[in-house]
Amino acid sequence: GEYCHNIQLIPGRGHHIDYNPTTPWLKSFVRTPRPLHFVWEDFPMDGRYRNGFYNIHVHERDTTGGNERTRYEMDIRDNVVSLSLERVKYMTVEREPKWGIPMVQHTSCERATKGRFTLYLSPDMVDFDCKVSVIVNGRRVFNGYLKPDVRHLATSCACFFDPERLFPAAVEVAL
């Protein structure tokens, strides 16, 4: 669930980029569509948010104080799903001189206190024959048996459009 980011500013290239080095670099990584651990920062691109990521479909975001970014960290171990949600703010302290791209930033985080999302789960992530606990920001929001339902397969398909991310069970979470 972790990504290695590699950004190179190439003078004189603008958006005319030689993508030939990208494919061999990407090939050295393995896609994990249903990770047991991830850290994801949800933010708008050109004013639009993604509907979801990994196994989470976000319905409402915590935009307290004009905040646009939320960091989600998930760990699954022994049928316990632990999630931490934080509002994230950046303060740029150094910019690249030619294009003004932020190069060094200070980060501050606060626990998210609002929001609503669907957490999708599959049998390769948790054991459906045993109780599952979901803990969000230290608070237990679910403790019980998951009930597989074709409805969750359909809604996860509609959200992610990814055959590797079809989930038979879901937990609705409201902070």
Regions found by a protein language model. Give the residues of each.
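Alpha/beta-hydrolase-fold serine-hydrolase catalytic core, especially in secreted/extracellular enzymes
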Residues: 1-175
